Design a protein with these regions (language model features):
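C-terminal GPI-anchoring signal of eukaryotic secretory precursors
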Residues: 669-683
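Catalytic-domain carbohydrate-binding cleft regions of carbohydrate-active enzymes
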Residues: 24-45, 82-84, 95, 106, ...
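Cleavable N-terminal signal peptides of Sec/SRP-targeted secreted and luminal proteins
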Residues: 4-22, 681-696
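Residues at secondary-structure transition points
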Residues: 13-14, 147, 676-678
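Beta-strand-rich N-terminal accessory domains
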Residues: 21-111, 119
Length: 697
């Protein structure tokens, strides 16, 4: 909570055009700012300044220095007009605090306000609070463990906004978007904290403060943009064009079309040559396709050695293993992390003596991670450290026959804090993630990372953080969809969903395993089917033949629609449009669409409505604007959106999905490869018969 000595100048920022100003002023004072009114006042608590406009968007700005002298009666203030024909502008100066407000007047159909507040005072905290508003839905913000959609009810208690393990904030782009067509974008170089619905109920507050995990800077700065457009889609497209880098290409197409098979959830750390061979053979014996088999934790001699344990109990002939897997048609990928544990003495000593570890301002290099209480992490902002790390990986690829890598961790929070990193101090600490992803992307578009900061341009998969094996919004199945939507809105459309069924952790213990139920496993795969890739670890044949048949069918359906997924990815490359947008993307002024958190789109041509509620065999489906063909049962009935379909039958075998009519006609006129296979039709026929039996009984 704020201490009583703090003062809070407040800015209510709304639309405004033009200005009339003086220079030195005595408070209170009001001046014209376009068609708005800019008012400054003071009291014993400090300085307040307000802009009011008709549409009512409210942003409260605050500057706290602890011991304030701003309210002294003899204080002089300078208010200066800096407008041009295309931009309204006002500058306000008091002591070392400089506030600049600008508004773009070049387009009457939209408006963009740009606010910069700077102060060189030590210990200053600058803030801005957006009133979320009754009846207004908000989207965006960070990846989170409790991932809501929309996000206005999320709670954040004055937390540093950077990539971190805590709360699963692996994506931390400073961007929010409202259903009213408003976006908020904060300069990512800000020493940023957020507070939502905690200190100020009903508000999203952003702050700049130079305290841990941020290094001390010469000044404190809060810079942000607020764009106002006719609807959220138009606003998002403008924000992407202005602030987000577009990918340069699409990721590996085989990873898109065919599943990744990982040893992690099923076997945890208990992997060896025998288990990997058995796993591969099971995949083939059950008729499943594959892009690659990923050997996860624990294959090293010690954590950080990047050297296979070649004991008889582990991997006595790793090259022989990978050669055999290649002969079976598998590519082989390897789990890699950026840590070296202290007890991995040979490699730890080399890295320590060469200065390859990230350190804090006191020179401390120790950190902890989930497989090491005493460890250090490679500094990916250090070019020599990157060269040492990546050259060892390249040598490992050649000697062990490894095709690509799954890179874990990479969030800035793994470095000792506040970290001393190479590069612009204003970009620290998240510059660690920026350099981590870029260094490892040099291994090609078949890699995966799990974190991102200003790295939307990379042609690689970004994996969701580990999901829990549950039906709840506590990191369970429903958050597979909401996380997908949040990542897409942040510009990361090449999403690798976490493993089908979750990770099976018991009470958060990494080496324990509780299998998902049959129902949860099947519903998870169905929800995943039209996402960019499928990742298995738990397997369908651990259940029964019905599960195998259902899962094989949806795995094949995913591959059949891989060209559509790639089309959507190419649209992201060209235009920055999401690969998997929210439903409102096609109906951006329809308030009913804003709260749909259990449906998603593939591009603009497929609507997916999976069942994510335990025990449910029907669901209500919202179809946005457009003409839709019901592809679920192969009947291709036509629906005109926007409309609701209530109590749509969706027994366990069924994933409801709809194809945009003109796209369906294109598919029908082609090879028909995207239409339901005979096995899928058989499953749906069986499902219909089962429903009829239930009805008549």
């Amino acid at each position: 909570m704020w201490v009583s000595s703090m003062w809070w100048p407040v800015l209510f920022l709304c639309a405004a055009f033009g200005a009339v100003f003086g220079n030195e002023v005595t408070l209170p004072v009001s001046v014209k700012f376009g068609d708005g009114l800019l008012s400054f006042s003071k009291n014993t608590n400090g300085l307040f300044y307000t802009i009011n406009e008709q549409d009512g968007l409210t942003v409260e700005n605050s500057i706290s220095t602890g011991e304030s002298n701003v309210a002294r009666n003899n204080q002089e203030y300078t208010l200066t007009e800096c407008s041009t024909n295309e931009e309204a502008c006002v500058e306000f100066i008091i002591n070392d605090v400089n506030v600049i407000l600008k508004k773009d007047l070049s387009n009457r159909a939209s408006s963009v306000s740009h606010v910069v507040v700077n102060s060189s005072t030590d210990g200053v905290r600058i803030g801005a609070c957006v009133e979320l508003g009754d009846g207004v839905d908000w989207f965006g913000g960070p990846e989170a463990k409790y991932q809501l959609w929309p996000v206005q009810d999320a709670q954040w208690n004055y937390t540093a906004y950077y990539t971190k393990e805590d709360d699963a904030v692996a994506i931390a782009e400073p961007y929010w978007l409202s259903s009213q067509g408003t976006y908020l974008y904060v300069n990512p170089a800000t020493s940023m904290f957020i507070d939502q619905n905690y200190l100020n109920e009903g508000s999203l507050c952003i702050y700049a403060e130079n305290v841990t995990p941020y290094r001390e800077r010469n000044y404190t700065s809060l810079e942000y943009w607020i764009g106002r457009y006719e609807d959220p889609r138009t606003a998002h497209e403008a924000a992407v064009e202005e602030f987000f880098a577009k990918p340069t290409d699409v990721p590996d197409e085989r990873m898109i079309a065919q599943p990744v098979w990982s040893t992690w959830a099923r076997y945890k750390i208990y992997v060896n040559d025998t288990i990997v061979r058995q796993y591969a053979q099971e995949i083939l014996d059950n008729g499943f396709n594959h892009s690659q088999l990923e050997i996860d934790d624990f294959w090293e001699t010690c954590y950080g050695s990047l050297t296979f344990n070649t004991s008889d109990e582990k991997f006595p002939d790793i090259k022989g293993l990978t050669d055999d897997l290649h002969d079976l048609g598998f590519r082989v990928t390897l789990w890699v992390h950026p840590f070296i544990n202290v007890d991995c003495t040979e490699y730890y000593s080399i890295a320590e003596s060469a200065g390859y570890f990230a350190k804090d301002v006191n020179g401390t290099i120790l950190t902890t991670w989930w497989q090491g209480e005493n460890a250090s992490v490679i500094d990916f902002t250090n070019e020599a450290a990157v060269e040492w790390f990546t050259s060892r990986l390249t040598a490992l690829q050649a000697s062990a026959g490894i095709d690509s890598f799954k890179f874990d961790a990479g969030e800035a929070s793994w470095a000792p804090e506040p970290a001393v990193l190479t590069g612009n101090v204003e970009e620290s600490p998240s510059i660690y993630t920026y350099q981590f992803a870029r260094a490892l992307a040099t291994f090609g578009n078949g890699i995966e990372v799990r974190t991102g900061w200003q790295t939307q341009d990379l042609a690689i998969f970004v994996r969701m953080l580990d999901k829990d094996t549950s039906w709840t919004f506590e990191n369970g199945l429903p958050t597979l969809i909401t996380t997908l939507l949040v990542m897409n809105l942040a510009g990361y459309g090449f999403v690798l969903p976490d493993m089908v069924g979750g990770n099976g952790y018991i009470d958060g213990v990494l080496v324990s395993t509780q299998y998902p139920s049959k129902e949860l496993f099947i519903r998870w795969l169905q929800a995943n089917t039209f996402m960019p890739s499928i990742q298995y670890s738990f397997v369908p044949w651990d259940y029964d033949n019905e599960t195998v048949e259902i899962c094989r069918t949806y795995t094949e359906l995913h591959e059949a629609y891989a060209p559509t997924i790639i089309e959507a990815m190419n649209a992201l490359v060209a235009n920055g449009t999401p690969v998997n947008p929210p439903v409102w993307w096609l109906d951006p002024t329809n308030s009913e669409a804003y709260n749909i958190s259990d449906e998603y789109l593939l591009g603009e041509v497929i609507l997916v409505a999976p069942v994510v509620v335990e025990g449910a065999v029907t669901r209500d489906i919202f179809l946005p604007n457009g003409t839709w063909r019901d592809a679920t049962y192969g009947t291709y009935d036509i629906y005109e959106g926007p409309t609701w379909i209530y109590d749509y039958p969706a027994p366990l075998e069924v994933l409801p999905y709809f194809v945009e009519s003109s796209y369906w006609e294109t598919l029908s006129a082609g090879s028909g490869a995207f239409l339901p296979s005979s096995s899928l039709t058989a499953i749906y026929t069986s499902a219909i018969l089962a429903l009829l039996i239930q009805l008549f009984n």
